[in-house]
Structures are given as structure tokens and as C-alpha cells.
Amino acid sequence: MDLIDSHAHVDVSDFDADREAMLGRAQAAGVGTLLAIGNGPEIEKLGAAVPYAERYEWIYAAAGIHPHEARHATEAHYAELDRLARLPKLIAWGEIGLDYHYDHSPRDVQASVFHHQLDQARAAKRPVIIHCREAWPDCLRILDEAWRSSGLGGIFHCFTGTEGEALSGIDMGFLVSFAGNVTYPKAQNLRDVAGLLPLDKLLIETDSPFLAPQPHRGRRNEPAYVTEVARTIGNVRNLPAEEIAGVTAENFRRLFGISHSRTRSGAVPEEHHLTSDREGNL
């Protein structure tokens, strides 16, 4: 299968004992491209995904301040993110957004940090990866006010909302990504949404090491298991998993302006996400 795992945390300590083997299993399963996510709260951890993108041709990186960590954000964090955005394989800003389920950071602080990073991502011409949990009205409002006009779009990562919320995001240029929780027996609502949305607006991910799909539930998740997400969505839509894999891979490439050969070779994305001025400073 031609698979892209659009969201994985491969830098975390869960993989320290077998990271090389884990990445090998991903490739053996057909994962030709992986987007590795770096988040704080420590400044040096914002770029935690970058070394993997620089080492492995098939891995790209993203960086951002997670809403859980918004209370830790400082000007130094923002400056580090601006620096990271100049790196050629840092192709997305995130994950960023709002989380009202845990409220690890005050909601007004989450909103402020979210706004700030949207401004930075717009300046850097990077699509954004959105984390939204139980905060859809505020999240969609902020994106409508501060992001829609950028034309850069992004990803609703690990989507858990309604069809209407997904369509609102799609209207603003977002793709909707489903993770391992779409496979859970009690997640029929998510499967319904995955079956109703336009196929050219879907992505799949693992959110590794979290949310292992049903066959592996209760254990550590890893990128190879993105096949289970493709299979589940394929079952919902009466399509082979291979077709879900191929279409979602093309959706990812289209968002980031990269060709099939470039996702396999790890080349730098097309010019429309890297301005000539910024390329001169890479």
C-alpha cells in the first residue's frame, strides 16, 4: 500500500528501546511518508522531530506549542519556532489549537497562544495542524477570523467532531485526519463521519504512540498500524484499504505541494510553501 502517516510522535521515550525497528516496521507495512510532530514544553523539544526528518528521507517534521503547554509559552518559544520554520523539512506548524477536555492551560491563554502561532504560520507560509477537543465553536471561530484568508489550509488532526464541524473546516481549506480511535467499537459516530466526508478531504494517521487501533488496543501504537485506520475507513466506504491509502496519500501531497516521488525521496516541498526569500536563508 501507498501509505502516509500524517501524524506521529516518533521522538518520544516510548520508542527509545526499538525506534529503528519501529521505523523499519512502518516501511515494511507500506508507510512511504511520515509527518513527525514536535511539541514542547521545553524550548529544545519544539524541534524534537527535526533530527528524524533530517536523518530519514521519508520523514518530514512539524513543530508547534500544544494547547496543553500554552501556559509555558514565552517569546523564546516563539523565536525558536520561527527558526525551525526556516528548515527545509519543517513543512507544517503544529500541533496547535484548543483543548477544553483537560484544560491543562487556561482557556484564554490557549486562545492567545493559538492566535500567535497562526500569525507565525501565516508569515512562514506553513499549513497548520489543529488539535481541537471539546472546543469546536471557539476553534472554528478563531480559524475563520485568523486563518481562512491565508489560503494555506491544514489538518484537523485526530478528528473527533461532527460532520458539520468537519465540513466547516473543509470550507476553510482543511483536510480531516482520522486516527486509531476510529476503529473502536463505540466510535460509530466517527466512522459515520469518515463515511460521509468527501474522499479527497480525508487523511489517516496513528498519533503514535497514542490511540492504538482496536487490534492493538491497550498497547503502544506505532506508524505501521496506520493500515488498520485505512482498513476501517475502507470498510465504511465499501472501498479497498489500498484505495483509501492511495487517495489519502495524494491528499497529503496536494496539501504540502509535494509529488509522489518527493514523498519517497524526502525532497523539499514545492515553492508555494517556501518563498524565495526564505529559501535564501535555509
Which functions belong to the PLM regions below?
Residues M1-L282:
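Mid-domain alpha/beta scaffold segments of enzyme catalytic cores
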